Each structure stands twice: as structure tokens, then as C-alpha cells.
Amino acid sequence: VFPDRTPHPSLLEAKRAQQPFTLTAEICDWSISLTVTSEHLFRATDNERLNWRLGSLSDAHLEGSQVLQLPPEGSQTIVIDADSNLLAGGDQEILLDVWITTEQATHALSAGHEIARSQHVLALADTTRERETRPAEISHQGEQLLVAADEVSWHMDAATGFITDWVIDGRALLDAPVADCFVRAPLDNDICSSEVDNPSPEAWLAKWQVAGLFDLEHRCTGVEVKGATVTSQHEYLNDAGVAIRSVWSHTFDAEGGVDIAIEVSVDPEMPPLPRVGMRLLLSDKPEAVSWLGRGPHENYHDRKLSADLGAWSCDRQAMQTPYIFPSDNGLRCNVRQAVIGSVCIERIDDDFAFAVSDFGVESLMRAQHTFECMEQSALHVHVDGYHMGVGGDDSWTPSVRPEYLLNAETYRWGCRLSVAHDDRT
């Protein structure tokens, strides 16, 4: 727990991993078989209620509950009848959420306390449907490329190849260009057993510093306009030469949105990257953030057992985790859509991860204590196609499991940026 006794995200992970019930579900002839198994060795259930909800990320279609009566290490299967069209999926995932709560208060637990929870994805959403849009018109104004669509306008700098301005109803949304981001504020596990005067050469931080990852020099090598698509090519250089290349394809539509497809190529001599994503600096700081994805609390790709898929919303401050030693925090994974004030971010093909911060990477890296974190005037939003795992299975060592390392030579990802409307979620 934190000093104020609020739960640490890892405590929620531990609770889910060590809960005393196992819950499994499968579809059988358009019905759902839900099996609950008790891991209590000597105790029968006498104060537990089984609850379930069947629906999409944002809507419940069927709900139910019943008293749970199991002997020690016993199992019980219930059958949930569901509409065949619902289980066939469609535009949205179909999920079964199951949780077990206390019936009556005990000396240790209040009535309704959640003892166990599990989520089961029964049908995947169809993501192959193409969006029907009209292409936008792109004009040239010196070194600037201008896209105007209804009340929305975009500006791209032909010299840097990045979007520099995004204006809605005369209000500028960006405080800096939308650009690649490959770094994160180092975690304890990234620093591992390093000492102030004796850094460990095996630490991820040391390897990133040797590779010059935090000091890469950006160079735009070309910008091409073809119809409603602007393609820009970028190089990031360290002392040894070109470390990373990226190609951004921006396709603007007449509704004021842009689909961004990004391909990143990494020199094979580079260490695994912390992230492959983009950074947006937003001028406005909304009070709340909402998203469709894993939540409600912070989760990383190797730390998301307790983070369920759903439609979540919370205060901007709650999107950030105040670790005693300032570091990267607040990531949410497997996101389909995020709404941050006037900005809507949507997946195109694959899910993304995102984080919202009042501080930013540089401020977090400079600070040694939370009170030293300097809040920035702009809101830092990271949208990641890929993000390295946290690791730390054996305490503070560079022990990220191989499947959560970003050591490929090529990455492809993308997202859509558009104006957020009340009916988005």
C-alpha cells in the first residue's frame, strides 16, 4: 500500500492471482457453462454469493446472481441461456464478468465485499469493417501543409514531417508537435540494483543511456503528399549513426479526423526499447478521462491480470500513480478508444496503450521524490503501439520476460485522432 494506505496496483494483482476460487466459462450450443471451483481445503462456502454479467464493454444484456454452496475443493456448474445473435459478436466484444461477494458482514469483511473476480471474452469484435469517410483537401502554405475540414484544421510542418497544430472552432489543442516517443521514465526495475555512484551495466537504464536513447537527434528525410495522405520519413541518430527510422502515413478525412499508420525500424544493435509510440502535448487539461479497454487501475502488459476490459472513466489525477520514486506510471492497455477532453483516440486495427500525465518523462526523470515532480502546463498523453513489460519477478533486476521485451527490428501500429463528441462512448 501507499503511505495513505490506498492500494498499490501490485496489491490488486496479488489479490486476483491468489483468490480462493477458480472460475471458467465456455460456450455450449448457444448457452454458457460457468464452472466455479473452491480452493478452500477444509471450509465449505456458507457466506458467498455468485454474481455474473453478460454484455459488451459498455452495456449489460443479462445479469444474475445466486447463493454459492460448495464443499471444500468442490465445483459447481451453472448454465446461462443466451441469445445466439449476442454470442455471435459483431461490432463489439461479448464479455462474461463473474464475481463472488460476501452475503453477510463478518468480523473482517463487510457485506458485499468482493472475494474473487474473473472475466471471459466469449466473442471478439469484428474490426475488419472500413470506416466510410470522404477525403480531405490539403493545401500548401510555404513550409506548411494545411488541412481544413468543417470546424477542424490541421497544420503539418514540411520541414519536420509532424503535425504541429490541431485547431477546433478556433481553439488550438496542441502545445507541441505530435511526434514519435521511444522512452519512458525509468522504473525501479529498469534501474535495478544500481547505486548512485555505481550503476549496474546490466540495468535497462544503463543500456538505454549507452545507446543514447534519451538523446536521439531527429531528422526528417522526406515528406510526400498524395491525395489526402501525407507520408513523412524520419531518422533518429545516436553517436553510431541511425538508430531508429519511422514512416508516418497521415490520411485526413473531411470529417476532421486523421488515420495515422506508423512503421518503425530499429537498428539490430539497439537494446530493447521501452516503448514504441507517440506523444501528444495537449493545451487543455480536462477534469476526467474515459476509455474502452483495461482498467480501472494502472496496468502494464505483464501486469494486467486484475485489470478487466470495460468502459472506464476517472479523474485525471486518478490516471496517474504517485510512486514514492517518480517513474513511468498510469498506463492502460488493450484500449479501443480513449477520450481526453476534446480529443478522441481510436484503434484502427490493433489495440493501443495510453497514459496521461501532468508531469511528462523529463520531469519524472529529474525528480528523486514526489514533491520534486514539476507539473507541466501541457498535458502529456502517450499513445503506444508497443510498451515493454515491467518485470521484477525476482525483485529489482532486469527480469522482463522475453515475450514482453521490444527487441524486434520492425514495428507497425497506428491510431485515429478526431474530435470527441458526447456520443463517442
Q: Residue locations for each model-derived region?
A:
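Substrate-binding clefts and catalytic carboxylate motifs of secreted carbohydrate-active enzymes
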Residues: V1-E73, L86, F352-H380, V390
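Conserved, mostly hydrophobic/aromatic
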Residues: A14, V36, V98, E151, ...
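Extracellular and select intracellular beta-sandwich modules with Ser/Thr-enriched
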Residues: L62-G64, H113-S118
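Solvent-exposed, conformationally flexible loop/turn segments
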Residues: P71-T77, A408
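Beta-strand/loop-rich accessory regions of lumenal/periplasmic or secreted enzymes
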Residues: D83-D91, H120-T425
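Short, aromatic- and glycine-rich surface loops/edge beta-strands on solvent-exposed regions
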Residues: G90-T102
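Beta-sandwich strand segments
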Residues: T106-I115, D394
